[in-house]
């Protein structure tokens, strides 16, 4: 026995309700974080339950179901469909906003990654130049030490030369005295000896560590090497 037209219509309506209910469920899962959307979906869910209850009553009543009742159910479904379209539209707008925000976040991440890469490259370059600067400063200090040795050697030679000259003059002075030389010659020897002794003392003071004439020291380089 074929189902009566009204029974077929009720079945179609029930299938339609099931489909709408499924769509609403999907909409709910995609918008759980939105409180307003959640309330709207709950309202739609309540309507579906009410409509489903009425359809069940129609099924129990069988042929007694009036066309007016079926039309009323159709109207309710249309209203429900419009509400679902609103929900879907809101969902689409939320998804579009999410995609826009996600795109901006990805762009920011990409920019940060590029900045990090440049900073790392810059740090490598800075480290290279710092190492080179330290190496050159060490060279400067070593060269200054060698230069200082040269000054020390120079003044050691000068001191030895003056000491030799003093010894020679003292021998000449002694010989002059033993030979009965004139006071003028002896005074000259004495003055020259005293002068050389003063120069020798000044030379020794000037060569205490390093001579003041050595102006080539790089103080900054020495301080950096010490630290």
From Swiss-Prot:
InterPro entries in the record? Pox_A_type_inc
Can you supply a Gene Ontology BP term from the record?
viral process
Q: Which residues form a coiled coil?
A: 4-210
Keyword terms, alphabetized: Coiled coil
| Identification of the protein by name | 27 kDa A-type inclusion protein
Organism of this sequence:
Vaccinia virus (strain Western Reserve)
């Amino acid at each position: 026995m074929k189902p009566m037209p009204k029974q077929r219509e009720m079945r179609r309506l029930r299938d339609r309700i099931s489909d709408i209910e499924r769509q609403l469920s999907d909409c709910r899962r995609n918008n759980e974080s939105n409180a307003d959307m959640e309330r709207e979906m709950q309202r739609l869910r309540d309507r579906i339950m009410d409509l489903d209850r009425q359809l069940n009553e129609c099924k129990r009543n069988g042929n007694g179901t009036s066309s007016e009742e079926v039309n009323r159910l159709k109207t309710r479904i249309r209203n429900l469909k419009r509400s679902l379209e609103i929900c879907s539209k809101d969902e689409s707008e939320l998804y579009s906003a999410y995609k826009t925000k996600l795109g901006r976040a990805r762009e920011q991440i990409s920019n940060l990654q590029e900045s990090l890469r440049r900073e790392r490259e810059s740090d490598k370059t800075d480290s290279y130049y710092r190492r080179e600067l330290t190496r050159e400063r060490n060279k400067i200090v070593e060269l200054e030490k060698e230069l200082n040795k040269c000054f020390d050697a120079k003044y050691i030679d000068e001191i030895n030369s003056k000491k030799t000259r003093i010894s020679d003059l003292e021998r000449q002075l002694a010989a002059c005295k033993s030979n009965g030389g004139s006071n003028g010659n002896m005074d000259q020897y004495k003055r020259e000896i005293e002068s050389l002794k003063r120069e020798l003392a000044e030379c020794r003071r000037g060569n205490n560590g390093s001579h003041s004439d050595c102006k080539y020291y790089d103080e900054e380089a020495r301080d950096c090497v010490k630290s």
